[in-house]
């Protein structure tokens, strides 16, 4: 047993540890969130408050009091959503820990007076549960303290505040107030057997008898009063449909929850069904009747409505319910239950009749009772009046000036002799302070004022003398006869006689007083003589009246500051507006001048006047105005135009822009004169940008006048000035593409002007003062051409399927000069359309006849500054070149998209073009210049130069190839020493040797002299390849040797004798250097090799027979030169060198006998 107990204790301690840890974790989180609340944004604050509410009130309610102040402090946050979240937190607090009600109820009362209607509605929604939970909590207290009493007082205050909100201006606040009052009525009433039962229901039966804060009877009376207010509100004629439906629903709920009120609710529904508010529209009437039908059906299901079933059934029939539907709604009851309810109905009716009869008797008895003057009440009124008068007099008697004035005023009225009454009542003034004397005199005078019912104390007296029921002594009746004393009878008769005499006397006095009053009334009814104004006044001169008028208006105008300080500036503005709109012209012009003196600060007054003139023009106002012979809109137009001109003349540039824009955008109507003035303003250089933007905004914001403003922009889009044209076209694009305003009209105008270009000379419609071209011109100018197609080109990217076709038609039919103008203007629209435009790609693919130049220009534009052209574009251009357009220029823009083989195939055709085009081609191929530096080619500069050397001269002129190679070699940044070495290395491997190889070698030596050793090696390799068999190359070989002498002399010694003889014959200047070199070689040991005697003889010039293998002297014609097929495996050989497959390689002839003794070239030993 002990082990079990110990284990239980252990489990409890462990649970406490986990609970403490959970609480500590939650506290840490909430502390962090509260710290973040200080600097967080409103949305973040709401999220953090929701987290705090979920953590504190959801799982760790013991932390609620600790962090309550941190959350409640946000009730003063400027953001509405944050304050609503605080209300939600307070509502949840009152549900979870209602004992914290005294701490939060002040915040609820404060937020109920919030400036935001949304916050007020949320507070009213929360007050429903707060009031219910608070009422239950206060009822559960055995000994409520001061905090509980204060909480109940504030709850009562909140209840009163929400009750006042039933007449609030906001519809939503009224609806929420109705729902709250519904809950109050249910809470403050008793439930019975037919009441609808709900979980957590509360009624007056749950209020304990010992509760000292409130009593059942008081709460019940208050609930009944609130129900009466709801019923009264439900029957008002000005109620809105939303409030009416909400009030109907609330009354239905009250009747279901508290059937005791069923009769009043059914009667209210009956009145509503018979008399719907006249302010409702047809749709609202339908909604109200539908809601009323639904609520009546709900009531009929309740057992408490058995007594009123016939009334409800009649209303439902009137609202469209069938008999079967109604019968299904009536709850099922057995016969005993129905009999019991019928009996209760009869008892209630009998009690009602009895009560009505009892009330009628009491009312009749009350009327028959004899009344007498209530002297006690009259004395109390006199005392209260004396106190009020005494206080009033004491305050004034403390002022010496008032006392002195009073004495001096009444001193002459004193009698010559002292009245006897004064002597009787006078008491000598003892030694009293001034304050005591003032009190004494004030009391004395106050009593006199009260006697005469004068002074401020007269308000304490009731209008009628206070009366009370006269008490009559009960006389016991006896069955025995009483003896009557004759003296007593006589005494009684004398008293009765005196009473009659007094009554007669009073009646006579009353009649005399009534007669006097009647005389006064008759005199008052006599009509006084009316005096006519013309009889007693003299008319003022006209000029004087006008001066008085203008002075009065000027004083009103000059009181601007005083009216602002006094808070009546709006009333002053309204007064000035009416005066300006209805008074003669001199007043109008004076007010206009006053406005224009400081138009920036008085623009609101100008707008008020403008709208007043508009109201007069449209007949919206009851004010009259001075009739004139002008048109009805003259005053409005004159005011608007003067305002516009005044702003333009008197304001600086910045204010002018702002105010002109406000006037045109806010004016109720814009006459044609004002629009024309805006057009003239837009011609000003400083205002053109803002003016055209304003015209565009007017076209958007004033739909009835959009045709006029679009027409203005169209005129500006073909204006002679370029800046106006560009601005207008940009705004037309916005209207055309973004706002979709009159796109058909804009298309029509643009195409009409585009077709002007097809004519031989500019038509007359192009020239007008509105377009800035008043003088007609006989011939087309470039500027005029651009004006005609400018708008069409601007709209081309937004509707290419229409404009591109029209532009193509115009391009085909126009002259060459205009075609060039069109081609130069295509850049911007084509770039906006982009390479992925299907319309452009289709045009490139189709390329109608006569459109080749236009298509090529479009391709150029689409490939500008693009690293690699679009694949689809390259494909279309390739197909175009192969199938339709044989002009190689079409391939130039897409060079960077071609493959290596395609580039080599088109290169011979490209270099045959004019020099300017060839220069551009090589700029593209080599990436020269900023325009082409970003392009990537399939061939390197080395490959390009090698490909140029391998071009077949039968296909391309040698001069074109020479120019092309010169263009390449001129780019020293690209063709460096290393690049040229690579080029020459590849060229020497080509068979047959390229014709221009030695020329390129010589140019390379000229550019880079340090290539001499490399060139020497090339020359040796050329001897091996029998360079003398190609005449042009042989000549270049010899020129290279000449440039490299004397270093090149050993190269000559490696030539066969016949070629050495030929070299010395062609270049005699080589002989001395060669002789010198040979002599130097003779002085050295032979070391196994040397110069033969035959060579020495050739060098010395002696006659030596040299045998040549053929009659050509060793030269082979180009058509018989052996060409080796390239081997792809060799890197040094370019795979793209064209091979003449038609030629069969010739066998190399064996060397002659004399050549066998010649030394081999270096490296061939």
UniProtKB/Swiss-Prot annotation:
Compartments where located: Nucleus
Where do the HEAT repeat units fall?
Answer: 23-58, 61-95, 98-140, 147-186, 218-257
Q: Note the InterPro entries from the entry.
A: ARM-like, ARM-type_fold, Symplekin/Pta1, Symplekin/Pta1_N, Symplekin_C
Q: Which GO terms describe its biological process?
A: co-transcriptional mRNA 3'-end processing, cleavage and polyadenylation pathway; mRNA 3'-end processing by stem-loop binding and cleavage
Cysteine pairs forming cystine bridges in this chain are none
Keyword Repeat on this protein? Answer: yes
Is the Repeat keyword given for this protein? yes
Which residue intervals are annotated with compositional bias (Basic and acidic residues) in the record?
Answer: 367-384
GO annotation, cellular component aspect: histone locus body; mRNA cleavage and polyadenylation specificity factor complex; nucleus; tricellular tight junction
- Name the domain of life: Eukaryota
| Coiled coil regions, renumbered to chain | none
Location of the region described as Disordered in the Swiss-Prot/TrEMBL record: 365-384
What keyword terms does UniProt attach to this protein? Coiled coil, mRNA processing, Nucleus, Repeat, RNA-binding
Consequence of gene disruption: RNAi-mediated knockdown results in overproliferation of testicular cystocytes undergoing transit amplification leading to increased incidence of spermatogonial tumors.
Q: Which SUPFAM superfamilies match?
A: ARM repeat
Q: Name one GO molecular function term.
A: RNA binding
**Quaternary arrangement and interactors, per the entry?**
Interacts with Cpsf73 and Cpsf100 forming a core cleavage factor required for both polyadenylated and histone mRNA processing. Interacts with Slbp and Lsm11.
Q: What is the similarity comment for this entry?
A: Belongs to the Symplekin family.
Functional summary from the UniProt entry: Component of a protein complex required for cotranscriptional processing of 3'-ends of polyadenylated and histone pre-mRNA. Involved in germline stem cell transit amplification, differentiation and mitosis-to-meiosis transition.
Q: What is known of its domains?
A: The HEAT repeats have been determined based on 3D-structure analysis and are not detected by sequence-based prediction programs.
Give the protein name, as stated in the record: Symplekin
């Amino acid at each position: 047993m002990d082990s079990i107990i110990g284990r239980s204790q252990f489990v409890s301690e462990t649970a406490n540890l986990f609970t403490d840890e959970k609480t500590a974790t939650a506290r840490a989180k909430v502390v962090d969130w509260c710290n973040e609340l200080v600097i967080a944004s409103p949305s973040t604050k709401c999220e953090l408050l929701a987290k705090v509410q979920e953590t504190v009130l959801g799982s760790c309610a013991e932390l609620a009091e600790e962090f309550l102040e941190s959350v409640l402090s946000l009730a003063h946050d400027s953001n509405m959503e944050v304050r609503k979240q605080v209300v939600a937190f307070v509502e949840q607090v009152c549900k979870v820990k209602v004992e914290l009600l005294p701490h939060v109820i002040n915040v609820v009362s404060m937020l109920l007076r919030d400036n935001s209607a949304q916050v007020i509605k949320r507070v009213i929604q929360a007050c429903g549960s707060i009031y219910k939970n608070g009422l239950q909590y206060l009822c559960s207290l055995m000994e409520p303290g001061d905090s509980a009493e204060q909480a109940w007082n504030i709850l009562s205050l909140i209840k009163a505040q929400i009750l006042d909100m039933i007449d609030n201006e906001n519809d939503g606040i009224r609806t929420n107030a109705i729902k709250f009052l519904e809950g109050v009525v249910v809470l403050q009433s008793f439930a019975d057997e037919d009441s609808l039962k709900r979980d957590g229901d509360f009624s007056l039966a749950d209020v304990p008898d010992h509760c000292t804060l409130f009593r059942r009877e008081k709460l019940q009376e208050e609930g009944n009063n609130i129900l009466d207010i709801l019923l009264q509100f439900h029957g008002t004629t000005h109620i809105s449909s939303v409030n009416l439906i909400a009030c109907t629903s609330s009354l239905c709920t009250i009747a279901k929850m508290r059937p005791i009120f069923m009769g009043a609710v059914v009667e209210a529904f009956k009145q509503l069904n018979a008399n719907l508010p006249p302010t409702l529209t047809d749709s609202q009437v339908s909604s109200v009747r539908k809601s009323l039908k639904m609520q009546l059906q709900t009531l009929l299901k309740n057992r408490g409505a058995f007594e009123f079933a016939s009334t409800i059934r009649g209303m439902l029939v009137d609202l469209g319910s069938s008999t079967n539907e109604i019968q299904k709604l009536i709850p099922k009851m057995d016969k005993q239950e129905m009999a019991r309810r019928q009996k209760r109905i009869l008892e209630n009716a009998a009690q009602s009749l009895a009560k009505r009869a009892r009330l009628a008797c009491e009312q009749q008895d009350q009327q028959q009772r004899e009344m007498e003057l209530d002297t006690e009440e009259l004395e109390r009124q006199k005392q209260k009046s004396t106190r009020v008068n005494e206080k009033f007099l004491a305050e004034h008697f403390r002022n010496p000036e008032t006392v002195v004035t009073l004495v001096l005023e009444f001193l002459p009225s004193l009698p010559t002799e002292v009245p006897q009454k004064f002597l009787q009542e006078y008491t000598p003034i003892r030694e009293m302070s001034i304050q005591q004397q003032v009190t004494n005199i004030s009391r004395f005078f106050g009593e006199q004022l009260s006697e005469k019912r004068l002074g401020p104390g007269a308000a304490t007296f009731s209008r009628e003398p206070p009366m009370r029921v006269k008490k009559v002594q009960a006389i016991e009746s006896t069955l025995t006869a009483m003896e009557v004393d004759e003296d007593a009878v006589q005494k009684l008769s004398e008293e009765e006689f005196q009473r009659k005499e007094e009554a007669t006397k009073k009646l006579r006095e009353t009649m005399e007083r009534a007669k006097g009053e009647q005389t006064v009334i008759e005199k008052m009814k006599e009509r006084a003589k009316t005096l006519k104004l013309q009889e007693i006044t003299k008319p003022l001169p006209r000029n004087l009246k006008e001066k008085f008028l203008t002075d009065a208006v000027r004083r009103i105008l000059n009181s601007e500051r005083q009216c602002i300080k006094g808070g009546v500036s709006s009333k002053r503005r309204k007064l000035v507006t009416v005066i300006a709109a209805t008074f003669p012209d001199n007043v109008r012009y004076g007010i206009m001048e006053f406005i224009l003196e400081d138009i920036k600060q008085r623009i609101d007054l100008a707008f008020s006047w403008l709208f007043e003139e508009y109201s007069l023009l449209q007949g919206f106002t009851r004010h009259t105005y001075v009739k004139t012979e002008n048109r009805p809109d003259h005053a409005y137009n004159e005011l608007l135009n003067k305002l516009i001109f005044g702003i333009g003349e008197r304001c600086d540039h910045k204010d002018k822009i702002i105010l002109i824009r406000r006037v045109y955008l806010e004016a109720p109507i814009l006459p044609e004169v004002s629009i024309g003035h805006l057009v003239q303003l837009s011609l000003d250089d400083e205002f053109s940008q803002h003016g055209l933007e304003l015209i565009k905004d007017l076209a958007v914001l004033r739909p009835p006048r959009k045709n006029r403003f679009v027409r203005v922009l169209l005129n500006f889009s073909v204006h002679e000035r370029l800046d106006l044209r560009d601005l207008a076209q940009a705004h037309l694009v916005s209207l055309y593409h973004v706002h979709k305003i009159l796109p058909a009209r804009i298309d029509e105008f643009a195409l009409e002007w585009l077709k002007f270009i097809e004519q031989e000379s500019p038509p007359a419609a192009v020239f007008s003062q509105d377009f800035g071209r008043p003088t007609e011109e006989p011939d087309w100018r470039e500027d005029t051409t651009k004006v005609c197609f400018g708008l069409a080109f601007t709209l081309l990217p937004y509707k290419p399927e229409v404009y591109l076709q029209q532009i193509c038609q115009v391009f085909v039919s126009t002259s060459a000069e205009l075609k060039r103008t069109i081609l130069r203007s295509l850049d911007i629209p084509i770039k906006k359309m982009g390479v992925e435009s299907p319309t452009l790609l289709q045009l490139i693919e189709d390329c109608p006849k006569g459109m080749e130049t236009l298509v090529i220009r479009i391709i150029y534009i689409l490939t500008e500054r693009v690293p690699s052209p679009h694949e689809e574009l390259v494909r279309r251009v390739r197909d175009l070149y192969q199938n339709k357009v044989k002009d190689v220029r079409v391939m130039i823009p897409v060079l960077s998209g071609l493959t290596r083989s395609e580039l080599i195939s088109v290169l011979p055709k490209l270099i045959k073009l004019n020099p300017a085009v060839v220069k551009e081609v090589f700029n593209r191929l080599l990436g020269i210049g900023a325009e082409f530096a970003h392009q990537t080619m399939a061939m390197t500069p080395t490959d390009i130069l090698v490909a140029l050397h391998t071009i077949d001269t039968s296909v391309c002129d040698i001069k074109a190839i020479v120019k092309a190679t010169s263009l390449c070699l001129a780019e020293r940044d690209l063709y460096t020493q290393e690049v040229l070495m690579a080029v020459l290395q590849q060229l020497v491997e080509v068979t047959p040797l390229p014709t221009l190889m030695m020329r390129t070698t010589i140019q390379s030596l000229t550019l880079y002299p340090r290539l001499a050793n490399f060139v020497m090696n090339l020359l040796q390799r050329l001897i091996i390849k029998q360079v003398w068999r190609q005449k042009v190359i042989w000549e270049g070989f010899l020129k290279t040797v000449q440039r490299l002498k004397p270093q090149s002399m050993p190269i000559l010694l490696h030539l066969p004798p016949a070629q050495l003889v030929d070299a010395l014959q062609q270049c005699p200047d080589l002989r001395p250097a060669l002789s010198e070199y040979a002599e130097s070689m003779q002085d050295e040991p032979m070391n196994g090799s040397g110069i033969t005697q035959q060579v020495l003889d050739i060098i010395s010039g002696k006659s030596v027979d040299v045998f040549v293998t053929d009659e050509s002297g060793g030269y082979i014609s180009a058509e018989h030169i052996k060409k080796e097929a390239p081997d792809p495996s060799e890197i040094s050989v370019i795979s793209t060198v064209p091979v003449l497959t038609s030629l069969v390689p010739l066998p190399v002839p064996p060397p002659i006998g004399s050549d066998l003794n010649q030394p081999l070239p270096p490296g061939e030993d």
